[in-house]
Amino acid sequence: MSWGSLCLLSACDAGHGRQVEAALLLAGKNRIELQKVLEHYKEDEEKYRATCFLIENMPFYGFYEGKALENYHKYYEILSDTLCNAQIVADSLEKADGPFSLSQLTYKRDIETVDSAFLVNHIEWAFKVRREQPWGKNVSFDDFCEYILPYRIGDEPLSAWREELYNRYNPILDMARTSTEAEDPLFAARLLYDSISKIQVLYTTVQPLGPHVGPSVVDYRAGPCRDFTDMMTYAFRAVGL
């Protein structure tokens, strides 16, 4: 997801800036939750600016929810567990549950839904890797906001995924942290990419037309190119790359 292509990062001067205020106007009753986060980080300039960045972009994003989403995920679960022919799995599920359609789901907007606890959790974990990883100092703040900070990739359901995926992927980079190249983000990124690339996956172009799967894609390890791109994105963000 290219957040910056939709809305340029503001310095949040003069309070929280016009773009943030415009987003807050769209938040409705949820405005108070977002303002809690701005207040929470008012003494930490970087975290405050990061909060502004996320809030500015929230009007452009949302997610789907509904019971039909369970059937959509069932496709990935079966495919991952059995490694069956993807077309057979898709046809069997359609016969059992009927065709999947986004019209069966309810769309919710981030700006009206994201609460303060959720947002603080993501910001804290994003800054943990920014400030603790040796390569973090060599990732510009703009790049951090654009590629590491976002809590979502597309239209997947909201979830607090950072801690779990940090604990999963961070040990892979123990060697990077003790290397003479520890401060080089590219060096760490290559190590992580090489490690993840060795995982057995099932690639298929057969897929019900639906939203992004979300962080569970790292467990499914099956699907089309979009899902493997998402898997890499979650892993890299979780460790500050």
Residue ranges of model-derived segments:
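Bacterial N-terminal signal peptides
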Residues: 1-8
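N-terminal accessory/pre-domain segments preceding catalytic cores
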Residues: 12-189, 194, 217, 238
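Active-site neighborhood of thiol-dependent amide/isopeptide-bond enzymes
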Residues: 176-241
